[in-house]
Amino acid sequence: MNDLFAASPPTLEGIHIGIGGWVYVPWRAGMFYPRGLLQRRELEYASRHVSAIEINSTYYAAQKPATYATWRSQVPAGFVFSAKAPRRITQSRRLAGTGTQIEDFVGGIAELGQTLGPLVWQFEQGYRLEHEELTGFLALLPRQARGRRLRHVLEIRDAAAVDAAMLALVRRHEVATVFTDSPTYPSFADLSTDLVYARLMRSQPRLQAGYPAPALRRWAAHIQAWRRGEDPAALPHLAAPSPVADTPREVYVFFIGAAKQRNPAAAMALLQAIAAG
C-alpha cells in the first residue's frame, strides 16, 4: 500500500493543475482511488497525482486551524491548495464591512503555510455586486499571511456584474478573476495581474480522460502561453488581450463539476500534455 504514495506529478514551475476537493464517493473503488484505500489517506494519495486542489468545504464553513495543519502535513513539497472563502462573507449585504470576518478566515487558513495558494471569493448569480461595495471589499483583502504573499481571485457568476468597470477595478487592486470555461457562468479570460486562475467545467462522462486529447493539447498550449506572460487571443475576452508581460505568470487550472468522476483523469492527462509540450 505504501507504493501508492510514491508517485508524483510532473514538476512544472509556476503551473499548478488539479481538481476540486478530494472527498467524492465515485472516485473510490478504482475510479481514482485504489480499492482498499483508507478514506483518511485520500488527500495523501490525491496530492501525489495532481499538483493542486481547490478546497470547496471552506465556502460553507471555515475549518479549525488544526484541520488546516493536518492537511498541510499530508501533502508533498511543492503541492498547493487554493481555497474558496466562506459564503457568509461573499453573500454579505455589507461587503465593505466584512473586515473582521476576512481577518478571522485568513488567520485560520494561514495554518496551511507553504501549501497555501490563492483564495477564491465567489459571488453567486443574483448577488448585486455594487461597484462601491466591491471597491471597499477589495481594499480589505490582506496581501500577506504570516510573512508570505497572499493572492486573491474573484469568481463573479452574475453576468450583470461583469463589465469594463469591474475589470478596471480589479486591475487597480491587482486581484485576479476566474476564467470559467463553462456554458453556465460568465466566461472571460481578461488578465488583471500576474496570476491566472482557470476553472474548466466541460468534462464528459463517456471519455476516460474527461476531454478529447486535442482539447487537452489546446489547453496545454494556452497554459504554456499564460506562463510565458502571454494572453491567448483565442479565449473569450471583455476587452483586447493584454500585451505580453515582462515576467512569467503563475497559473492555476482546476477541473471542476461537469462529469466530476472524470476530473482527476483529466487533470493527470493535462499535466502529462504540458510536460510533453
Place the predicted regions along the sequence by residue:
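Residues lining hydrophobic/aromatic ligand-binding pockets adjacent to catalytic sites
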Residues: 1-277
